[in-house]
């Protein structure tokens, strides 16, 4: 690939780490946010994100020797963000010279990165356990049917983390029931639940959740990278997405 080739980039900016994946190159950055730049003084959320990504892009260009800009990017965002927040995320990337910006909700990306078939009618349940945010979602036909989230305020030991995860899953089940989506509840009992994010590696978490809910629970391969891997699966579709935008 030419050093001047225009890049397509998958981005996952979490509370503690930022991960960048370049199409045809794989993960090129997986670092603590604090290591990238001095971020004190950036109170505006958009400017903060732009500062983080500017430092991340500079680090990638330095390491790879590529002289080209990122042309198109797909960024994972929390489920349920407002239209204003979406514009902030998009604006941060546009300010860095990224021409085309696409957003994908983190639970959807996590499920895709974990290898779940999100487009089929049968439901998938994913719980993404990040450094500060836990998101549990039920997905069917490439859409999020239900999503519940909880901020991790302070350190949670394994017992309290397990209780929090179980509570979020049960809230999703109740939401599906209230919407009359009983078939999705049956799907979850059959297909089980997938755990992603660094917190998924908590010792005994998967088995405790499985026992409490009486369904299969698995931890994704490389759960910390599930979101960015899922975002990367969108990159080959960018040409068609751009066409659909008009």
Predicted regions and their residues:
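Gly/Ser-rich catalytic serine loop of serine hydrolases
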Residues: 130-132, 198
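Nucleotide/phosphate-binding catalytic cleft detector across ATP-hydrolyzing
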Residues: 1-15, 19-126, 139-193, 200-228, ...
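A structural feature that tracks compact, well-ordered secondary-structure segments
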Residues: 135-137
């Amino acid at each position: 690939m030419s050093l001047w080739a225009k890049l397509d980039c998958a981005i996952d900016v979490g509370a503690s780490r930022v991960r960048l994946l370049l199409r045809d190159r794989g993960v090129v950055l997986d670092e603590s946010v604090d290591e990238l730049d001095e971020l004190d003084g950036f109170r505006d959320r958009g400017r903060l994100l732009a500062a983080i990504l500017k430092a991340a892009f500079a680090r990638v260009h330095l390491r790879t020797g590529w002289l080209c800009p990122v042309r198109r990017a797909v960024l994972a965002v929390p489920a349920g963000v407002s239209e204003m927040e979406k514009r902030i995320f998009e604006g941060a990337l546009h300010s860095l010279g990224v021409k085309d910006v696409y957003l994908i909700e983190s639970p959807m990306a996590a499920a895709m990165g974990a290898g779940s078939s999100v487009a089929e009618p049968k439901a998938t349940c994913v719980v993404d356990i990040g450094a500060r945010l836990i998101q549990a979602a039920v997905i069917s036909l490439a859409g999020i049917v239900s999503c519940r989230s909880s901020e991790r305020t302070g350190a949670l030991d394994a017992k309290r983390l397990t209780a929090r995860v179980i509570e979020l899953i049960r809230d999703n089940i109740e939401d599906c029931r209230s919407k009359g989506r009983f078939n999705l509840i049956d799907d979850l009992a059959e297909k089980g639940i997938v755990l992603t994010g660094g917190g998924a590696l908590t010792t005994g978490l998967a088995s405790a959740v499985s026992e409490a809910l009486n369904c299969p629970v698995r931890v994704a391969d490389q759960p910390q990278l599930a979101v960015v891997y899922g975002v990367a699966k969108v990159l080959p579709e960018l040409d068609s997405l751009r066409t659909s935008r008009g």
